[in-house]
Amino acid sequence: MALAIVARTQGDEYQARWFWMNVCRLFEDRTKVFRVTYEQHNIKSFDDIAVSYGAGMTDEDGHPLVADYYQVKFHVTAAGTITWQGMMDPAFINAASVSFLQRLKHAQGQYAPGGIGARFYLYTPWSIDAGDTLASIVSRADGRIMLQRLADGGPRSKMGKARAAWREHLAVETDEELLTILRPLRLRQGPTLQELREALNLRLQLAGLVPVEEGSLIHPYDELTRKLLQAGQTSFTRTEIEHVGKREKLWRGHSVVEHGAYRMGIRSFFRWAEHLEDETDDMLCLLACFNGRKPLSPKLWHTTVFPCVERFLSKMQRGQPYYHLHLHTHASIAVI
């Protein structure tokens, strides 16, 4: 009984801290986020956290992006992994009858028809099983399913068997329908609970919120999240969070030195640049061309990467006196 209570409590803390990590994005200089919601009730699945964007936000492929929805799944131990078959098992998400993939299908049909417009994240400290078919089709760049790899192979291949099983499970007839359902999915491995606490402390300081004292047993943001939920306050803009922070004596403000520079960013690595769009006025995302350190095809350097970078940098010649260039890229891109 005690262990079950600990597991539930730690799961709530994990979700609350990831919520505050996203709340801090509201205070970025060039943020595209205008609202963050805890327990989003208008979406039955992926409702743990919702991040809503203003006009001009795009996904990794340049399509308009309205929101990111998160299902946060904490596990007390590392005694488990994510597999392609497990995603069809309701027990994987502690459900009785509806699987993770079925929830994805429902959410995609409601908020990302055609596979674009929203992204759906599974955020968990568990990793993908290295020996599973899923490991060979999930991008290390951004956690998406690499649809071309999944589509490769005939009915008797590993990919063909996975496609067939998923089609049957989701009650769809064609691979095209299946790939549309999977297109907005992102599988993201989160840190440990302690690592998330440490990362959040840095974000809180940058956002102008009071960090949690190191070694403290009480985490005020965990407790505040519970109290706000009980009061029915679950969705917040920047102004509303600032008001809550001042009321709870967790707001200290911050000053940002702004030199009038136009900030441009290029990203080919996801880690440490997850929200580069919040720090820049204009951003070029090249994640779709890479899987970790390696390009998906050597030809992409000449057909896509170089032309895109060249066009993007040509904007720097259009009359703006100062530029800040943020490069979270492979060294080969940085020297172009």
Residue positions per predicted region:
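Acidic metal-coordinating catalytic centers involved in nucleic-acid phosphodiester chemistry
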Residues: 1-12, 63-336
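Catalytic centers of nucleases
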Residues: 4-87
